[in-house]
Regions:
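Structural beta-sheet core signal
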Residues: 4, 99, 165, 176, ...
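Glycine-rich oxoanion-binding loops at beta->alpha junctions
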Residues: 68-85, 283-305, 328-364, 370, ...
C-alpha cells in the first residue's frame, strides 16, 4: 500500500526523502509529498504532487529547501480520490502539526464531526487529516507536548496506523507510532542520524542498524539522543532493540523472499485485512450490550437501488480474474438470488451480448488496464448497463471508465502469475454479495453475521496453511518431471481447480487442465495412468461424498492423487498418495483457503525446474493489447 519515509540528521533532508520515496515506489501509489521542518517556530515547507515521485522531485529540486528534518509519503487512495489535496503530508488547521499516515482510521467520520463542532475546518476527504487535527486539538490543550498529544489522540482512534508526526516549534525530532501497519527506524552509529520507513528499503544504503516498532508502541526520535520508546497501552518504557540487517535493496523489496511470487503468496493474510479494513466493521448494538458486523461499501452509496433492482448480472474478466468471477457468480446467486453469467471479456465484446438497461456488468481486472475488459465495459455502457469495476490499480483506466466500483487494495502485484489479487477479488465479491443480500433480505441475519465473522478470520486460517510451506515444497517433486496434470473440484472449488491448473501451466510450463470433477468421466479419465498427477479439492463443505467417489475412480486407474482436504479428514488419506489439510470454513469461503496450496505448489514446481518464477516466458503482467 502506501509508503512512509523520514529523516532526522545533519544532511539536507529533501534529497534523502525523495530518494527514499523512489525506493518505495514498488509498493504502489497515486500521489507523493514531503514536509520539511527547517527552523523552530517557522512554518513547515510542504510539497505535494499527484502522480509520480519524479513530479515531486522536480518541484523540490527547483527550490532546494534547507532543512535537516523531514517526513515523506507515497499515497494509495483509501479515503478520498487521488489528488494533491488528499496527498500526504497533512497539516493541522493551526499549522503547528504535520503528519504522514499509512492505514485506515475506521471511526474518522465520528471524530471529524466532533472536531467540526469544535471549530475545525477540513480541506481534504481523508481520515489522515482528521487524525492530524485530533492530535492538534489535544496538543493545544495539554501544554503543546507532542509525544503526550499523539499518545492521547491515538487512544480515541479506532483502526490501523503507522504515523510520523512533526511539530513546528521543535525542528529536532519526530514522533512515530504504529498499530497493525509496519514502521522501521534506522539508527546511525553515533545517533546523529535517524531514518524512518515503512520498511528498511529507504535506509539500508545508510545504516544496517534498525529498530522495528512493535504494535502499540510510540517513539520520540530526536537528533543526537537515544530513542524514547513507550508502550501505548500502559505508557511504560519499552526496550529499544537495535537489530543488524544484511540485505541489499532488491532483496528488501522482496521482503527477504527469493521471488516476488512467494512474497505475494505470504502477503495474502495482510492483504486480505487491508481489503476488508473499514469495510467489514463491528458496530455496537443499539442496546449497548453487544456488537454486530456491518458491511460498508462506499461504492454502493449512490448505486444501491439500481444494484438491488438488477435481475441479471454479467461478470466480464480475463485469466485469473475470470476464475474469481466464477466464484463471484456462486456468491451472488446464493446470497442475492440474482442470475449471474460470467463471460471472458474477449468473447463478450464480439458476441453481440444480450444486455438490458437494468442489467449490471461487473468488470474485474488486477491492473485495471486489460484491453479486452476495457472494450467490454465500453460495449456494456453503450447498451445502457450499470458498470461496476473491481480493480487493484488505483486511478487505472477501468477505475475511471466504470460507473462505480471497489478497489481490492492488496498493494502492487509484481509477479506475473496473480496470487494476492485473486484472493482480494474474491474477498471483494464476497463483501458485495453480503451487502446486496442483506439489503435484499435474501440471506438471514444469522447467515450475514456468520459470514462476516468468518471472512474476518480467514487471514489467520491462511497463515495456518502457509506454515505447511516446507511440506508442499516436498510434494512438488511429484510434478517436476511430468508433462501433464489434472485439477478437479466441484461447486465453489471448481473455479479453484481452474486457477490451480492455470498457475501450474503459467510458471512451470507443465500442461494442466482444470475440470469439474463429475465431468472427468466424460473425457479426461482417458488420460489417467500411473504417471499422471491429479489434484483434487475435496473439502468437507459441498459435495464431499461425490468427490470421494471421483477420487476412487482415479485410484482404480492408478492415478497419482494429491488432495486438498479439510482438517481432520480420515477418509481421503486412505485413497490418496498425499493430502494437504486446510482449516474448516463456510462453503462459500472455501476458495480463499483451498487456492493457497495450489499457489504454493505451482511456485515450488517452477523453482525446482529452475524457471523464472516472476517473469514466465511469453506472458505480461498487464495485457494492454487485444
Amino acid at each position: 500500500m502506501c509508503g512512509i519515509v523520514g529523516y532526522i540528521g545533519t544532511r539536507p533532508a529533501a534529497p534523502m526523502l525523495i530518494k527514499g520515496l523512489h525506493q518505495l515506489e514498488y509498493r504502489g501509489y497515486d500521489s507523493a509529498g514531503i514536509a520539511l521542518n527547517h527552523e523552530n517556530n517557522q512554518p513547515f515547507i510542504i510539497y505535494k504532487e499527484k502522480g509520480k515521485v519524479s513530479n515531486l522531485e522536480t518541484a523540490v529540486i527547483n527550490d532546494q529547501p534547507a532543512a535537516t528534518v523531514g517526513i515523506g509519503h507515497t499515497r494509495w487512495a483509501t479515503h478520498g480520490e487521488p489528488s494533491t489535496t488528499n496527498a500526504h503530508p497533512h497539516l493541522s488547521m493551526s499549522g503547528e502539526i504535520v503528519i504522514v499516515h499509512n492505514g485506515i482510521i475506521e471511526n474518522y467520520k465520528e471524530l471529524k464531526e466532533q472536531l467540526e463542532r469544535k471549530g475545525y475546518i477540513f480541506k481534504s476527504q481523508t481520515d489522515t487529516e482528521v487524525l492530524c487535527n485530533l492530535i492538534d486539538y489535544v496538543y493545544q490543550r495539554n501544554g503543546r507536548q507532542l509525544m503526550a498529544a499523539v499518545s492521547r489522540a491515538l487512544y480515541h482512534a479506532i483502526g490501523a496506523y503507522a504515523i510520523v508526526v512533526m511539530e513546528c516549534k521543535d525542528s529536532s525530532h519526530v514522533v512515530c507510532a504504529r498499530k497493525a501497519s509496519p514502521l522501521v527506524i534506522g539508527v546511525s552509529e553515533d545517533n546523529t542520524e535517524y531514518f524512518i520507513g515503512s520498511d528498511a528499503t529507504p535506509m539500508v544504503e545508510y545504516t544496517k542498524r534498525v529498530v522495528y516498532l512493535d504494535d502499540g508502541q510510540i517513539a520520540d526520535v530526536r537528533r543526537g539522543e537515544d530513542i524514547n520508546l513507550i508502550n501505548l497501552s500502559d505508557h511504560s518504557a519499552a526496550d529499544v532493540n537495535v537489530k543488524e540487517i544484511n540485505l541489499d535493496i532488491a532483496a528488501l523489496s522482496k521482503g527477504g523472499y527469493p521471488h516476488y511470487m512467494i512474497k505475494e503468496i505470504f502477503d495474502q493474510p495482510r492483504c486480505m485485512r487491508d481489503c476488508m479494513r473499514g469495510r467489514i466493521v463491528r458496530v455496537r448494538d443499539y442496546s449497548g450490550n453487544g456488537e454486530h458486523y456491518e458491511v460498508h461499501l462506499s461504492a454502493l452509496k449512490n448505486f444501491k437501488a439500481k444494484l438491488i433492482r438488477a435481475r441479471h448480472v454479467i461478470i466480464v474478466a480475463c485469466g485469473t480474474s475470470w476464475h474469481a468471477g466464477l466464484i463471484g457468480k456462486h456468491l451472488i446467486e446464493q446470497m442475492c438470488r440474482i442470475r449471474v453469467e460470467v463471460e471472458y471479456a474477449s468473447e463478450f465484446r464480439y458476441s453481440n451480448p444480450v444486455v438490458e438497461k437494468d442489467d449490471v456488468v461487473i468488470a474485474i481486472s488486477q491492473s485495471g488496464e486489460t484491453a479486452d475488459t476495457l472494450a467490454a465495459i465500453q460495449l456494456a455502457k453503450e447498451k445502457g448497463a450499470l458498470v461496476f469495476g473491481i480493480v487493484n490499480g488505483v486511478g487505472s483506466s477501468i477505475a475511471r471508465e466504470t460507473d462505480t466500483g471497489i478497489y481490492i487494495h492488496v498493494g502492487p502485484e509484481i509477479g506475473v502469475a496473480s496470487t494476492k489479487a485473486f484472493t482480494g477479488q474474491v474477498t471483494v465479491l464476497a463483501m458485495l454479495a453480503l451487502a446486496l443480500g442483506n439489503a435484499l433480505g435474501t440471506i438471514t441475519e444469522e447467515e450475514y453475521q456468520q459470514t462476516c465473522h468468518e471472512l474476518t478470520v480467514i487471514p489467520d486460517k491462511i497463515n495456518q496453511i502457509l506454515e505447511q510451506n516446507d511440506r508442499i515444497k516436498e510434494l512438488s517433486a511429484m510434478f517436476a518431471d511430468r508433462h501433464n496434470a489434472l485439477y478437479l473440484g466441484r461447486g465453489f472449488n471448481y473455479p479453484v481447480a481452474l486457477e490451480g491448473a492455470l498457475k501450474l501451466k503459467e510458471i512451470s510450463y507443465i500442461h494442466a487442465e482444470g475440470y469439474p470433477a463429475a465431468e472427468m468421466k466424460h473425457g479426461p479419465l482417458a488420460l489417467v495412468d500411473e504417471h499422471m498427477p491429479i489434484v483434487f479439492v475435496a473439502t468437507h463443505q459441498g459435495q464431499y461424498q461425490k468427490i470421494i467417489s471421483n477420487m476412487q475412480e482415479v485410484q482404480s486407474r492408478k492415478g497419482r492423487i494429491l488432495a486438498i482436504v479439510s482438517e481432520g479428514d480420515s477418509v481421503a488419506g486412505r485413497i490418496c498418495e498425499h493430502v494437504i489439510e486446510i482449516p474448516h470454513t463456510l462453503n462459500a469461503l472455501v476458495p480463499l483457503l483451498s487456492v493457497i496450496p495450489m499457489q504454493m505448489l505451482a511456485y515450488h514446481v517452477a523453482v525446482a525446474k529452475g524457471l523464472n518464477v516472476d517473469m514466465p516466458r511469453n506472458l505480461a503482467k498487464s495485457v494492454t493489447v487485444e
